[in-house]
Amino acid sequence: MDVLIVGSIAYDSVSSPAGAVTHALGGSATYGGLASSFHTNRLGLGTVGLVGVVGTDFTDEDRAVLTSNGADASGIETAEGETFRWEGAYHGAMAEAETKATHLNVFEHFQPNVPEHAQEPKVTLCANLHPALQASVLDQTKASRLTMLDSMNLWITIAREELLEVMKRVDLLIINDGEVRMLADDENLVRAAQAVKTMAKVATLVVKRGEHGVLAFHGDEIIALPAFPTSNVCDPTGCGDTFAGTLAAYLALGEGPIERDELRAALVASTVSASFTLESFGVAALQTMSEEAFDARIDEFESILR
């Protein structure tokens, strides 16, 4: 197995200036898994494994979506009760979601159980979960190349010390600019990122900046990329998870320490993947994204960067 992703699987109800959708398939493992498996197929890599929990209301059609790119869903547990549900709204420039309701349902008691055949992947991605659950995943696995961790402001607020401890166990940390400033208590983004990188003792820090792109702090080097420019902004939900899943796939391609050029290429691909997710509600754009469309957008983005 080349990539293992542990995260949430949810039904999302989302509204934005572009419209609305109810009970659409979502969650960090869903977006990350679809993106990662699309790219492992493109790159000729092995399987992407998913670990998560769903309720008895989770449909066969949605399970088929999770495995549509060949992902291994044997680590997805079905528990008695309803699947995790989230309701949110975006306004104006859609920089942040307003959470209307969160119903954890079966996710409230989720304890990750990584199947034996998935315990030694090339890359482990601990998607957005409570730090204690992320630590459990790291206890169960031994990635041969890279461990990655994504997080959010909630865990900084309610589980800061646990988060800092689990950060010290991974090779690459992904958080957004607001979370970096919050962790470091510093409004200067570069200074805050350098402080977080030091406190987390992490080799690579990737800072997501939404419509402003991404900053990566890798060793002593900094990589800065803009977002892919698009006028078709529909639903930002899942863009960060798409980004992380793509990054995991691209970094599963190499061997040994990550080189700067390798990381930059992975960040370019991750940025472009997220731009597709942005253009539809739910996972619709990830389901229809073709290799030809992706490659064309990569070429367009690289021409912008030159």
Q: Could you tell me what each predicted segment is?
A:
Residues M1-L4:
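Extreme N-terminal starter segment of soluble prokaryotic enzymes
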Residues V123-A195, G213:
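Conserved beta-alpha-beta core of the PfkB/ribokinase-like small-molecule kinase fold
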Residues Y31-G46, A195-M199:
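A short, N-terminal amphipathic alpha-helix
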Residues Y11-H23, F38-L125, D139-A143, D295-R306:
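Conserved N-terminal subdomain of the carbohydrate kinase-like
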Residues S36, N176, G240:
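Short, conserved phosphate/pyrophosphate- and ester-handling motifs at nucleotide-, phospho-/glycolipid
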Residues L34, W86-A89, G213-F217:
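Short beta-strand scaffold segments in enzyme catalytic cores
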Residues S8-I9, S28, T242:
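Active-site metal-binding loops of divalent metal-dependent hydrolases
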Residues V190-R306:
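Conserved phosphate-binding/catalytic region of the ribokinase-like
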